[in-house]
């Protein structure tokens, strides 16, 4: 089982430190925070080659959450759209040097929830993803798109629309299934998971109370994770605990891993 944490969950600015913490907490996978590649022209980034070497030495599998802050792959503004694609590709290039084999991105959004705008935004996203997938394939990096909550400003109105969009890529585009997001959405986890399962290679796990994206440790919200343990324990992909709440401590992270592994 490949299971671990998002970089933000570990509350450190050092990737090497995050790798060490991941191992200490019982994980074997770390998801890098792609936005660091862009912040202040990469001022906070460690050399990717040294990250790769340290990860291999510690037997840690690396994935990356591609940049999403101020990024919109569905933007109608050409300059923002082009810069968003450029930013994603820059992060993938850095990630490949660091040794990642899988990367996650957000779909983007629309300023108003209108059928015409949603249709056009999906076309923009499709074109952006064609560029990104072509580059990622050369780097041998798999790209996963994350299911949103399907709120007012999302470019997909529901999970069925999201599923139809993914099918259009003929298997080249995979899914990062976010349990917390699915719990908030109208159709819920069960329906969403069953629909998207053929495309899921990556999972984000965190808890909430079904109303907002709280990113709590397992058991602190209202998701009944016992229902999904068989799926998770037999899952061939990567599982990332995205527990970013300031209320949760490292003991909570460790316990969340143990719950999924069946150690508690």
Q: Model-predicted segments: where are they?
A:
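N-terminal pre-domain/capping segments
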Residues: 1-92, 96-97, 261-264
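Histidine-acidic metal/acid-base catalytic patches
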Residues: 1-2, 16-23, 101, 156-177, ...
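Hydrophobic faces of well-ordered beta-strands that scaffold small-molecule active sites
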Residues: 3-7, 30-32, 62-66, 103-105, ...
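Active-site-proximal loop/turn and secondary-structure-junction residues that shape catalytic pockets
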Residues: 9-11, 34-36, 68-70, 107-111, ...
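Active-site acidic/histidine proton-transfer and metal-coordination neighborhood
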Residues: 16-17, 56-57, 74-174
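Short, solvent-exposed loop/turn segments at secondary-structure boundaries
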Residues: 41-45, 74-79, 115-120, 154-157, ...
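Catalytic-core regions built around general acid/base machinery
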Residues: 46-59, 128-135, 192, 227-231
